Amino acid sequence: MGRFIFLSFGLLVVFLSLSGTGADCPSGWSSYEGHCYKPFNEQKNWADAENFCTQQHTGGHLVSFHSTEEADFVVKLAFQNFGHGIFWMGLSNVWNQCSWQWSSAAKLKYEAWAEESYCVYFKSTNNKWRSRACRMEAYFVCEFQA
């Protein structure tokens, strides 16, 4: 009886110590602060990459950053897996919801935008953001909440 209780307690300790770690993420995914991340070694345009991420796991999307530490973790993950490269993140102006205003403070009434949308990427060598046309291809990192 004492051996059963000891074994049960031991299993409980192991289970509790694994919660909140990489054990919450599927094989091949990396865990950080309750989210799972995976860089993919194939290039897609931004929309196709986002669509791909939504198909990988419920709640999946292109990576979004909410702290320097999170960005550093993902940049390091991308570099360790694939070396140098550029990777899409989930930030874009695809929906063109920017609030534009003329320097004269006049309201924008006339528009003649080109159809080009811009999306944001990071280099696997640092976590500085840059933008490029969403139609161009890049590697990407998917994320979902564990």
UniProtKB/Swiss-Prot annotation:
Calcium is required for ligand binding. It comes from the Eukaryota. Expressed by the venom gland. Residues 32-143 form the C-type lectin domain. Pfam families: Lectin_C. It comes from Gloydius halys. This is Snaclec coagulation factor IX/factor X-binding protein subunit B. It is found in: Secreted. Heterodimer with subunit A of IX/X-bp or IX-bp; disulfide-linked. Residues 1-23 form the signal peptide. Disulfide bonds join C25-C36, C53-C142, C119-C134. GO terms for cellular component: extracellular region. The keyword Metal-binding applies. InterPro entries: C-type_lectin-like, C-type_lectin-like/link_sf, C-type_lectin/snaclec_domain, C-type_lectin_CS, CTDL_fold. SUPFAM superfamilies: C-type lectin-like (SSF56436). One of its GO terms (molecular function) is metal ion binding. Belongs to the snaclec family. Its main location: secreted. Ca(2+) binds at S64, E70, E143. Keywords: Blood coagulation cascade inhibiting toxin, Calcium, Disulfide bond, Hemostasis impairing toxin, Metal-binding, Secreted, Signal, Toxin. When linked to subunit A of IX/X-bp, anticoagulant protein which binds to the gamma-carboxyglutamic acid-domain regions of factors IX (F9) and factor X (F10) in the presence of calcium with a 1 to 1 stoichiometry. Gene3D superfamilies: Mannose-Binding Protein A, subunit A.
